[in-house]
Amino acid sequence: MWSLHNIYCKEEYFMNTPPNYYMRDELAIEVHRRQQAGERGVFTNGCFDLLHLGHVRYLQEARRRGDFLVLALNSDASTRRLKGPGRPYVPELERAEIMAALSCIDYVTIFDEPTAGPLVSLLQPAIYIKGGDYASTQDGTPDMSRLPEAKVVQEYGGSVQLISYLPGHSTTALIAKIRGE
């Protein structure tokens, strides 16, 4: 099993990054190699703009559910489309490096699309995970209308799972606290 933390970035950054940064296609080769060896991949995605305890616990739990964890980060442009002007606070390559430093994350990639669906389709992880606060119904089951990636996962027979939100720990709450709100 790999113990190195590999950062996989968008192609345009490949020439300016350290040798352990790879393009999406190389990530797919590595993920598929591990899947063929019988390992269960876990995939999650998000902006992860200001890292906090809720993120860390979420990612640790995601990693426990499989043999390796792939984290797909929204690019700066994608984050702005989702969160609005002024975001992200931390540039994508810095977010990627920060996330790759966490021992629970095996692979990091950056995606620019509106959703991670195309990347999920390429990698076909055994398990797709999202935070329960993000996409659950009142009974705690995944709300497929809020999880566009879930349809992709279901098409190839993967599992969609939710991880409970850690109350009081969110990027929105952290930003409000910093602003004195």
Regions found by a protein language model. Name each.
Residues 3-181:
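Nucleotidyltransferase catalytic core that binds NTPs
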